[in-house]
């Protein structure tokens, strides 16, 4: 029998319903794995007592044949989802000891469906980063190692702890957040399925904000089916979130294994010009195209001319929104407060924020404040918003001809910890292919599609029309089926 912590969400549910094992046994298997691999630094807060209590309640539900859709399934949550009575830090010193008195909309939805929380996962501070190297709790180490040198690799970011937890079999699934690629890029780096739904599908209530017009909850799983199961539990209207979409929760599981014959899939191959993409990833892109052709899809060459400006636009809009959102951390109402004798209020603000925020967060606050200043708002912020509209128009024009779009999740494979740390613009470019869909608020998924010459996982990204998670899952499922001969599992786990 497969080790319990290696079971998928679907297989775990099947085993629990058939009384093959208990939720408590399932949780204990994950706790054992977490304890074994603490060196990866995937978790910042462990909630084992809560998990075991929830598991016992789940086992009682199964005994009475009254189980819910996620009854007894162990999951982890990125540490920016507020959890009532449980420390929520966004991995920043300014919130290091913050304990919220309310529950986020997404975690509440999962609890309502019977989910069991193992703990809160590490992340880049305030979700600002692409390598999980800006956390106040230290770097996350990927479970994966390259075949050539075995060096420690980044798991991607900002949801690197969640990616490491699921990839390392320390959680069956894990919540992440995706602002410019923070679920899809780590999923690509760690051989996982990483799904970001349409903006507004999942409640942002109780999520620590980075950039409010871009932030969206996402999910890491080890299969496309698991992704559909988790999404059905996460999605739902929340009146406490003004951007929440008031629609019925869609049935997504039927998309898995559904034929893609006749589907039109757009491929913007021109984005691969100029040597930006590593050769292994270009090779995977072309092989995935052939795979989808063999499955009956029609491949159509499309143009997304304004996506080349996506990174520049994102790094104006996101820091601008961050500078506004993070102004609330002033040492007065909650979080860190640094005081000295005879200190003025302005001095308290300055010292508290200087002590509480890390370098990357300070950098983005400064950029955001600059582009919002009266002298530069027209030249930068308003212009960026206009180009954002053009990026969205490119997608609308493409979706008039195609059902989904295929492109790589990231231009590179996972890199060594510290390798790109000295130049932040290099890590910013890792979101080159994920940012455009975020700017347009589209549903998208990264699905493992191959291995590099160094034995590292590579992900392909499927982007769909707004609210069309179903077809995104259809295409992702076809890709998954086409590469089922490849084992996306780190050695030693």
From Swiss-Prot:
Keywords (A to Z) from UniProt: ATP-binding, Ligase, Nucleotide-binding, Protein biosynthesis
Record-linked PROSITE patterns: AMIDASES
Pfam families registered for this protein in UniProt: Amidase (PF01425)
Record's catalysed reaction(s): L-glutamyl-tRNA(Gln) + L-glutamine + ATP + H2O = L-glutaminyl-tRNA(Gln) + L-glutamate + ADP + phosphate + H(+)
EC number(s) from the headed UniProt entry: 6.3.5.7
Cellular component, GO, one term: glutamyl-tRNA(Gln) amidotransferase complex
Record text on subunit structure and interactions: Heterotrimer of A, B and C subunits.
Family: Belongs to the amidase family. GatA subfamily.
Protein name: Glutamyl-tRNA(Gln) amidotransferase subunit A
Species the sequence originates in: Rickettsia bellii (strain RML369-C)
Origin organism lineage: Bacteria, Pseudomonadati, Pseudomonadota, Alphaproteobacteria, Rickettsiales
